[in-house]
Each structure stands twice: as C-alpha cells, then as structure tokens.
Amino acid sequence: MANDFVGAEHEFHSKEFALGWAERFVPTPERLRLFDLIFTELTEAVPDDGRIVELGMGPGYLASYLLERMPSVSYCGIDFSTPMLDIARERLEKFSPRVIYTQADLVDQAWEQRVTKPVHAIVSTWALHDLGSRDNINTVYQRSFSTLNSGGVLINGDFIKPIDAVQEFEGGRIYIAEHLESLDKLGYSNPRCLSVFETELDNPTSAQNYACIMAEK
C-alpha cells in the first residue's frame, strides 16, 4: 500500500529515543555519498584552519566524517537536543580540542550570536525539515547569512518534496525550488542544487528523497 503521508515524529529530548534513532540512522553507502559531496565542496571553500558550524548535528556522524578529513578546522555543532549532543560528544571525543557544542533551538534562540567568528561554512544534513515549515527554514537561512564570513558557504543536505510527488509531505519537506528562491531573496550568491539522492516517487518513505543545496555569501 502506498504511503499517503511522508514524514516522521521525533522525541529528541528523550535519551532513549535519541540513542535508538542514532543506531537506526548510521550512514548508509548512499548517505555517505552526500557526505562525500559536502566534503568536496568544503575543501574548496574552507581554509585549512577555518571554522565550520553544523546546524542540527545530531549524533555527530557528519562531524566525525569531516573532522577526520580536515585535521586543522574548528567545528561548532548546534542542536536543540541535549541527548543528541551527549551522543555526539562521546563519538567525537578524540577531536575534542577542536569541537564546541551548543544547545539551542535554531528558530527560537539567537544561536548566531553564540558562534565564534569568522565562520567559513555552515552545514546541515537531514535536520532543517524538522523545523516544520518553509518560514522556519527561511529564518535559519537568514541567521546563517548573518553568521557567515564574506565568501562563506552554506550547504544543506535535507529531505525535500519531489516536484512530481502526489503524496502529502510534512511541512518542512519543501520543493528544491523553494529552497533556492529563499536563498536568492536573502542575498545569497548562486544558490543551486548539487545533487538529489534516493529518489522514490511511487511509494516514498521518510528516509528517501533528499537533496544537497548550496549557496555562497
């Protein structure tokens, strides 16, 4: 039977839920392709000793991948879930001198004022859709713009609503064109979609249909 609604409910303030989610969401080969793409773009945009901010760092999978391959960068991971930050802190222990953890709600709290500058890149994966609406995503894009150094990059790998989908998608899963329009209106340079992953139109699950969006300040 086809899925009429595509979305998921989370309880990230629960330690038990966060641990279970982290175990289920270990990066697959397909998801690692997204990490590879993000890393490739960051090597062009971030100086060797630059600073990266991750929005919604979750259990630290992307952070671990990047810190392993970028041995001199500083990293700030932001998440509203204390249990997720605890999981990430344990996973990233060997990188501890280079990592700062910040607990904040990306929409309701001025996290950008707590981030050490300059920031050369802001990244996020499978997180901003959980904000629930295009307006909330726009708020985060605006705050990211004010945080980035001139020439800095924003890279968002997140679940999207495919243009040909007939199902109802949760509010934070928006069209690629909507992401690009928002970034353009906020003053970003050259907003674009780098790639789309795990496309499924007939019977999509909540873990399919995601894209990598990028823009510069």
Predicted regions and their residues:
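Short catalytic micro-motifs in class I SAM-dependent methyltransferases
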Residues: 126-130
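Short conserved loop adjoining the S-adenosyl-L-methionine
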Residues: 108-116
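Class I SAM-dependent methyltransferase SAM/SAH-binding core
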Residues: 53, 59-109
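Conserved class I S-adenosyl-L-methionine
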Residues: 1-46
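A short glycine-rich, Lys/Arg-flanked "PGG" loop and its adjoining helix->strand segment in the class I
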Residues: 138-150
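C-terminal alpha-helical "lid/dimerization" subdomain adjacent to the S-adenosyl-L-methionine
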Residues: 155-205
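C-terminal lobe and adjacent flexible extensions of AdoMet/dcAdoMet transferase-like proteins
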Residues: 213-217
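A conserved beta-strand element that flanks and buttresses the S-adenosyl-L-methionine
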Residues: 123
